[in-house]
């Protein structure tokens, strides 16, 4: 019932427009369905696992935002079920129910952008499935399952790089289990080998497939070489400010639930069953905290990596508190108190989020969560592109809105689907600008989109964006394109198409300009 309730909320909001990360994964998944290695047309820091999951979802349910979010609904439900199984095996059925409910609630929250199908949802799904399978393998002494658990940990890494930390946790947990019993060095070594071989297998297959496509150099540069810059770009002071900006907001969306989880963190001090599981829960907590801290960006959806262990701690609090009351001979009314307090905390969180979860339509939800980001407008722009281009045409988006490529079913004239690397403070920025200019000029896209919205650029002040990229943009558009439409973003977005766009002299604070190639 818990899974069904939260699935119904997600289903109501399935048509929320894709945000830009979703747009990237959806476009890459679309390319995979066409038999194209996404790194050929998408320069991305992300590993290909989530794009492959998107391809599967799009192939099953259709190529639109609703399909993506129905896929997320199923992934979230499966994750909740595996968390129920883990917590039940660890702390009992009551803990399992509370854990599943907590995860379903917290992972839906707007403060972690839980309605968007971010890679972190897929990392968590494979990680918790792997954890459940690893515990099953060890409890039932089924060595072959350790290899299968390793494969799942490897897939968690392929969804997004921080997923590797869950594999590190698995190694530590396996070692802890081995050392807590009569030592069998050979058996432990075999178990390590099975786990690591399983984790390496999907990664090796991925590298072989990309190498065969001829795009391994591009893949390696973006996902490993250039990622080193990205992962060290935020100073510690700025990272702490980002944590203070996003962390408290997340907690205040479900304060009662987070307090219960905090109580669960202390449970090993006052409950024997929680004490027996302390290495499992608290080492997983440590790894999850490290996972959300990598790079010090602390973006809202990064916190999804923390939610499984927070949910386990909430389950531990309610279950262990009930167990302690039972052992002290409490009355039936007192025995149900921990569960009732948890239900009250859940209901209060739902009430605090009632506008987004129960009242707003999908477009309103997008505007409420993402503010001036042009995600609803991207859909309209893409429809115009699709109606006025042919299937084999290419387009270019000068802005960080890859969802336009996905919606329009048109391929990108350049691999730079985000402008951020081009305008960040990093050694490759000017070189990347020149590369993008060359790719666009060589492709001569049929339509070009210029996104004049700050969140689509976020330029560093000391990068040569005005001198190089924007100067070229103005000249290139003037020489080769004519205005086809404008999305004027104000209190309510106003769209102007065709000849009317040429006559429009009252641009809004934020605008998206659509240009078509001049006839030769």
Language model features: what each stretch is:
Residues 16-18, 330-387, 401-408, 425-426, ...:
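Membrane-proximal, lumen/periplasm-facing interface regions of secretory-pathway glyco-
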Residues 70-94, 98, 105, 129:
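Transmembrane-helix motifs of polytopic, lipid-linked glycan transferases
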Residues 128-148, 178-182, 257-277, 318:
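Membrane-interface transmembrane helices that cradle and orient dolichyl/undecaprenyl
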Residues 136-154, 183-189, 193-197, 276-286:
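Short hydrophobic alpha-helices at membrane interfaces in multi-pass membrane enzymes
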Residues 145-161, 167-173, 201, 285-294:
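Membrane-interface alpha helices of multi-pass inner-membrane proteins
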Residues 149-151, 164-168, 358, 371-424, ...:
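Short periplasmic/luminal acceptor-recognition loop of GT-C membrane glycosyltransferases, typified by
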Residues 165, 289-290, 295-337:
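Hydrophobic/aromatic-rich transmembrane helices and adjacent perimembrane loops
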Residues 166-200, 265-272, 312, 318-330:
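Perimembrane helix-loop-helix junctions
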